[in-house]
Amino acid sequence: LIGFWYQRDSATFAGLKAFIINRIGDLGFILGIAAILYYFDSLHYQTIFKDIPKFIATNSTIAIWPGTEWLAISVICICLFIGAMAKSAQVPLHVWLPDSMEGPTPISALIHAATMVTAGVFMVARMSPLFEYSTTALSLMTVIGAITCLFMGILAVIQSDIKRIVAYSTLSQLGYMVIALGVSAYSAAIFHLFTHAFFKALLFLGAGSVIVALHHEQNIFKMGGLYRSMPLTTAAMIVGSLALVGFPGTSGFYSKDLIIELTHKSQIPGAQLAYAAALITVFITTVYSFRLIYLVFFGNERMEDNTHMQPVHEPAKTILFPLVLLAIPSIAVGGIMIKSTLDGFLQGPLFVLAKHDVTQQFLQMDFHGALAMFLHGFISLPFLSLLLGGCIAWLCYIKYPLLPQVLQRDGKLLVALLQAKY
């Protein structure tokens, strides 16, 4: 599907890149499966989970290279996680995902919201009884998630393609999910996976609506002032962006702030680094979301480069109807689901050791219902980070619109580094 427009070289290469990177991940995944088969003599979930305590007691080790013994459980978990890194686009196996924008926009929405990129997160959560016994693997996941979350968010700030900005935001949000897996907050990771699907599909389809209206223009610097002619698309994109930045009351707020709170409570090595990265990422997310909304829908029209046969207008109802359908859960689903998520709605297939159970600590000490969490959201650190990001974006794009050009001119090396994707 990424290579759907097969006559374009860029689309063909993007499909090939996605295929190759995922085969690298699959190598780790199949090694993990082979090790499970070797040690457990089965590939059935229930058999493996039942035999884990017995396997841990044996203290089996694997010599990765001569003179180096690693616990077999850690090697298995790390191999499985390498598979998840490719599917869920974690650094350094993330490079296929921005290029997947070569596919049609509804395909981008499908890949990023509901199918491929969530597969790795789901697999790790499903294998939680195995991962819980490897602090090494949990710590690795926490650090990798933090790196992805922060550094992929930074790349979104300099993008000019509307779809690529949303794609990098997906990478950043996947980083949050992997941080949650690393701190044993599996239910929070699945909850964010669930809420993220709605607002990410909304953002992609909203971007698609803009692209259709502008005759397939994707450069945000050739847009502007679209709120006058596309009010419904504008409202939908603002709702999606508020959920993305985690504005209190939106579905993204409940799942993302939950992950940040649980990470702060975790004792896993690397958790406090991830907490700091998550807070900085809230700031960065607000900057690039505000930038996208302002440059596309507000300010002066910059469509002189496009030759339009007719004035810009909202596309067909078939494009607008899904935006309305997705905007409702993007606001409401988080508040509805937060209580059942914390109360053990997913406890059947998930397993957490008592010493890692940050969710129970949060439930007993800090959670007093969806309304209390909403009100507390306005005095929390993530909200302050969000406000700071909003202020910086306002200064750069409304108060002093020439400031980004000055910064770009003075920081040529940094801009070159970001444009080369590190």
Ranges and model annotations:
Residues 1-311, 315-318, 329, 335:
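Hydrophobic transmembrane alpha-helices and their helix-loop junctions in integral membrane proteins
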Residues 313-422:
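Membrane-interface and transmembrane segments of multi-pass membrane proteins
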